[in-house]
Amino acid sequence: MFHMKETPAEAPLREALRLLEGTGLAVALGGSGLLGALGLAESARDWDLTTEADADRVAAALGGLPLERNGPDGIHTDHRIRIAGGVVEILCGFSIRAPRGVVRVPTIVSARVEGVPLGSPEAWAAAYALLGREEKFERLMSWLAVRGADPLVVSRLRAEPLPETLSARLASLPRLLAAPSGPA
């Protein structure tokens, strides 16, 4: 998928998407899968999906698939559901504890590639900054600096209790002038 050199099996990702979207849930691929789709990574160790639906609704939508549930821990204040032995991790209500409060990272579909809904690069840049993953944060910020950022997504993120430096970096991105044509 996405022309990456190394990825986990795609079948569990596609099955999760089929089941979740089939019940009307909005979901989006983030993490290394998103980076790979944007040409910013050559491998992914798992598929990270986000949704704003709660964990009970997600579990019900997965229709009896074997799953593992994890609640808030450490910096994560969300709930996570893992399927296929962790090949797919679904972050339900993706949120991260930050110095100024809990930051809710929205699930926004920015494009579809090979039938897979891609998450917002702006939202994942903010998430990576909050998670202390500086290299991935900078890759996404560089990508956004060239292509432009969706001003509505940036505004939504800046309404969260972000650290001032992160809020300022997001605000400094050039605005996306046209509708995105895809991840390239």
Where is each model-derived feature located?
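Compositionally biased terminal segments of proteins
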Residues: 1-184
